[in-house]
């Protein structure tokens, strides 16, 4: 086991001789930035809840969101696969057993498990943590799980310098149970859910209870809390993408310039800086989703308005062209039981109004007509 300083060695010897430890005693404060960002989050929620968009579009966004959550959360931990490859893995078109592929598949399974769990459950338990972590590292959901039984030092991959020395193994269960208890504590009921999610993400990754998968599990738990308590934004948001864009900001906000040793300040840390970062990231993510939903909504409303301008004849013609590619005067005459002159007069009116257009200007007889670009784009 490696230690960074003489003081780490002395502290380790001291703690090994004790049967109990002080619990985590993190602190935080509301700041103007946190309050303003919480307001932004709630405004975005109202927009997304209020504005209905086409179901097909909604499902496509959800599908894209899941792929991005998997991609960016595993990328943060060093996975080198690109987004398109991740999508293929999720769609079961890439069955490789290469490590990066397995990591993506495992994370996807854990995400799907928690999404389903959040529909009927909103608590955090040790059993839930074990199950999620089992899936993250590729074990069966109900496999026997244990916390790490030794020290798990986090090092800089390039310099090999110690970045973080988490609590000793013997303290993990106490710290996890404290985290769970405080999350469910009645006195914490008035704390906004985004802040509670941020606290859980920080505390879990700080406790670092497992040998591997701690960062991924911490982000999964935060997303689980947001979904379970109605902050999932219909499954449209991806905070991990914002983390990845400025990965140094993410790590610096977690570390907050504190000593690398858990016992030298991290267990008593003021995490306001981290919460400002977490809530700000969430607000930026939610605002982006809200703006996207507004744009989709307005476009879909325009489509509906165009359809509303069509009478029964025009609706039939639009549907006929969509199914057959084009229409002739004789097709209209046959369906509506009118003569060709009347059908051609209707067509002339529709051409002048910008509803129909000749498919080929060189045609003189038996002319084919199609929808104008305006209607082709809006009527699908």
Model-derived regions, located:
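FIC/Doc superfamily catalytic core
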Residues: 1-380
């Amino acid at each position: 086991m490696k230690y960074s300083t003489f003081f780490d060695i002395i502290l380790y010897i001291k703690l090994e001789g004790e049967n109990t430890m002080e619990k985590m005693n993190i602190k935080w404060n509301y700041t103007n930035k946190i309050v303003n960002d919480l307001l932004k989050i709630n405004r975005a929620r109202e927009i997304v809840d209020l504005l209905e968009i086409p179901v097909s579009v909604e499902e496509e966004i959800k599908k894209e969101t899941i792929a991005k959550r998997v991609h960016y959360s595993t990328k943060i931990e060093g996975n080198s696969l690109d987004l398109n490859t991740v999508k293929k893995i999720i769609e079961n078109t890439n069955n490789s057993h290469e490590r990066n592929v397995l990591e993506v598949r495992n994370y996807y399974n854990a995400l799907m498990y928690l999404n389903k769990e959040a529909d009927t459950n909103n608590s955090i338990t040790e059993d839930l943590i074990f199950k999620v972590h089992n899936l993250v590292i590729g074990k069966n959901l109900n496999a026997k799980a244990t916390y790490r039984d030794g020290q798990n030092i986090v090092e800089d991959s390039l310099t090999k310098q110690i970045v973080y020395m988490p609590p000793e193994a013997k303290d993990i269960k106490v710290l996890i149970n404290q985290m769970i208890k405080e999350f469910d504590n009645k006195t914490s009921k008035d704390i906004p859910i985004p802040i509670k999610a941020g606290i859980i993400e920080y505390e879990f990754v700080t406790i670092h209870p497992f040998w591997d998968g701690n960062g991924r599990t911490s982000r999964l738990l935060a997303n689980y809390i947001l979904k379970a308590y109605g902050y999932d934004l219909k499954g449209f948001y991806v905070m991990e993408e914002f983390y990845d864009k400025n990965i140094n900001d993410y790590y610096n906000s977690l570390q907050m310039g504190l000593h690398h040793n858990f016992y030298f300040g991290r267990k008593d840390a003021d995490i306001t800086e981290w919460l400002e970062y977490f809530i700000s990231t969430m607000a930026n993510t939610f605002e982006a989703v809200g703006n996207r939903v507004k744009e989709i909504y307005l476009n879909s409303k325009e489509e509906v308005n165009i359809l509303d301008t069509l009478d029964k004849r025009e609706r039939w013609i639009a549907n006929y062209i969509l199914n057959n590619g084009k229409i002739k005067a004789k097709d209209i005459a046959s369906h509506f039981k009118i003569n060709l002159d009347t059908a051609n007069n209707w067509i002339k009116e529709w051409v002048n109004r910008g509803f129909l257009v000749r498919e080929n200007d060189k045609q003189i007889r038996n002319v084919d007509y199609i929808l104008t670009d305006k209607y082709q784009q809006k009527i699908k």
